Design a protein with these regions (language model features):
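Bacterial N-terminal signal peptides
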Residues: 6-17
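Amphipathic beta-strand/beta-sheet edge segments enriched in Tyr/Trp
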Residues: 22-25, 82-149
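Short beta-strand->alpha-helix linker/helix-N-cap micro-motif
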Residues: 26-88, 101-105
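Short loop/turn segments that connect beta-strands within beta-propeller blades
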Residues: 122, 185-189, 230-234, 276-280, ...
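A flexible loop/linker signature enriched in serine peptidases of the S9 family
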Residues: 158, 170-180, 197-199, 217-225, ...
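Residue-level detector of Asp-centered blade-edge/turn motifs that repeat once per structural unit
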Residues: 159-161, 208-209, 253-254, 299-300, ...
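Hydrophobic beta-strand positions that form the internal "hydrophobic ladder"
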Residues: 165, 213-214, 255-258, 301-305, ...
């Protein structure tokens, strides 16, 4: 059985008014790398289709990243039918391929074994070779794992292809919309709903191992509360015993804590709390008359970034995980929301509202 390791960042913009969404993409500055992805060969015709499907998913993944251009298989001079011998690198140089992905597939009784090799065509050497064994129904996941390996060995950065997306799906007539918690693979495959739409769900976030989801929900149709949903069991549980509204949750990097905001009905403003999921003990991180919300842990778990109106407008702040050493990091005009740290910790993504427009 293949184990699941996936990471995901989701930025969700919520507004009370539905407006047309316009997304402007600027041109990239990196020239995509030509790469040849051959069909996985098999001595058993029953697995040829699966092998081709795996290769197609790998090609699609790499192309969508914007860093690779998979070459047309019609241009291939050599047809790889063995992994025991080195490819004829000159044949791949002729068609301008800088890297080559080749592999084979075999199996029986509902099980498959997939081997692949990644070659550097110009250096004429193998960069990586791996073998995966799993059930036949997991062939698509194997393709994503191979894609991640190819991506990492060429770029030096971890891939994102073996990941899932959690989001709020809105369906139904205009006057009776249903908002359901849903997940799918990063390439839109394997979509399914997790909740039935009988109650409102918002701001879902994955745990580090992607087996649990924390989100805000109106399960009781009263005050919104933070919940955790277990994907394997389908069970959900409320997070913490708070007398007021809890919202904007995120997991810590180790998955053992949740940072969220709490609005005390006796005070009215929102403060940030960290709840230990093992001990169920919560700790208040901010303490002032301002609204402090949308906290996110740094990758090492030592700091948090959040937005606050303590300066008069919504701006971004960083503090130690205990709330000390608060520092404002946004200075330009506009209001700032939903900050989240990059996996490397060198950047922070956020939503900005200025002049009636939203920007990411």
């Amino acid at each position: 059985m293949i184990r699941f390791f996936s990471y995901f960042f989701l930025i969700l913009i919520l507004s009370l008014k539905v407006i047309a969404l316009e997304v402007t993409l600027t041109q990239g500055t990196v020239k995509p790398t030509p790469i040849a992805v051959t069909d996985l060969f098999s001595e058993n015709s029953n697995f040829e289709k699966i092998g081709k499907n795996i290769s197609n998913v790998i090609s699609d993944n790499l192309e969508r990243s914007g860093l690779f251009i998979p070459l047309d298989e019609k241009a291939f001079i050599q047809s790889n039918k063995s992994l025991s011998q080195q490819p004829r690198f000159e044949d791949w140089k002729v068609i301008k391929a800088q890297h080559l992905v080749a592999g084979k597939i075999f199996g029986s009784n509902g099980k498959i074994s997939v081997e692949f090799r990644l070659y550097d065509v110009f250096q004429q050497k193998q960069l990586v070779g791996k073998k995966y064994e799993t059930s036949e129904k997991n062939w698509r996941r194997v393709a994503h794992i191979i894609s991640d390996s190819v991506f990492k060995n060429i770029t030096g950065e971890g891939g994102y292809f073996d990941t899932r997306i959690v989001y709020v799906a809105e369906t139904g007539p205009k006057d009776n919309k249903q908002k359901r918690l849903a997940i799918m693979d990063q390439d839109q495959a394997n979509h399914r709903f997790l909740t039935d739409g009988s109650y409102l769900v918002l701001t879902p976030r994955f745990s580090p191992n992607s087996q649990k989801i924390t989100y805000m929900s109106y399960v009781n149709r009263n005050s919104p509360r933070v919940y955790i949903f277990d994907i394997e069991t389908g069970k959900q549980e409320i997070v913490g015993e708070f007398p007021g509204m809890t919202f904007a949750p995120r997991f810590s990097p180790d998955g053992n804590k949740i940072v969220m905001s709490f609005t005390d009905p006796d005070i009215g403003n929102s403060e940030i709390y960290i709840l230990d999921l093992k001990t169920r003990i919560s700790k208040r991180i901010t303490d002032n008359s301002a609204i402090d919300v949308s906290a996110s842990f740094s990758p090492d778990g030592k700091k948090i970034v959040f937005n606050s109106d303590r300066s008069g407008r919504r701006h971004l702040y960083i503090s130690d995980v205990d709330g000390k050493n608060v520092k404002r990091i946004s200075r330009e005009a506009g209001s700032y929301y939903t900050p989240v740290w990059s996996p490397r910790g060198d950047m922070i993504a956020f939503t900005k509202q200025e002049g009636g427009q939203f920007y990411i």
